[in-house]
């Protein structure tokens, strides 16, 4: 998988309520500057984060992130048994490209889902709408 900072922990904290940059830095074991950079990256990716000086940060809307265990649990047993693996990545260029880099599974299908694709494209090279 493409190396990318996994911001799921940060998003979970921001979704739980308003927290200061200092509190986020302490809880995630990072500097306040690193938290600020990650928040700016999330904003650039389209995540709406409310931030007020002296009041902290909070998601403007609740986000439900992909969870492989929940997805597998919701699949009918005969379908789940046909899967070799089901992985959830934070950010990849293209799920299709990532899967093509892997060797074919000996049995079943390999599934890769991503919260964010930075280089994905539609059929025949069309851009995503």
What residue spans do the PLM features occupy?
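N-terminal lobe of the biotin/lipoate ligase/transferase fold
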Residues: 2-129
């Amino acid at each position: 998988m493409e190396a990318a900072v996994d911001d799921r922990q940060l998003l979970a904290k921001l979704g739980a309520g308003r927290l200061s940059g200092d509190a986020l830095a302490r809880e995630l074991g990072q500097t306040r500057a690193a938290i600020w950079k990650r928040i700016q990256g999330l904003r650039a990716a389209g995540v709406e984060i409310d931030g007020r000086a002296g009041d902290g940060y909070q998601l403007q809307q609740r986000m439900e992130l992909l969870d492989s265990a929940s997805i597998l649990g919701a699949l009918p047993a005969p379908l789940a048994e046909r899967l070799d693996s089901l992985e959830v990545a934070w950010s990849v260029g293209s799920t299709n490209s990532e899967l093509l880099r892997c060797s074919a599974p000996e049995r079943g299908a390999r599934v890769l889902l991503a919260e964010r694709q930075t280089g994905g494209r539609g059929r025949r090279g069309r851009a995503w709408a």
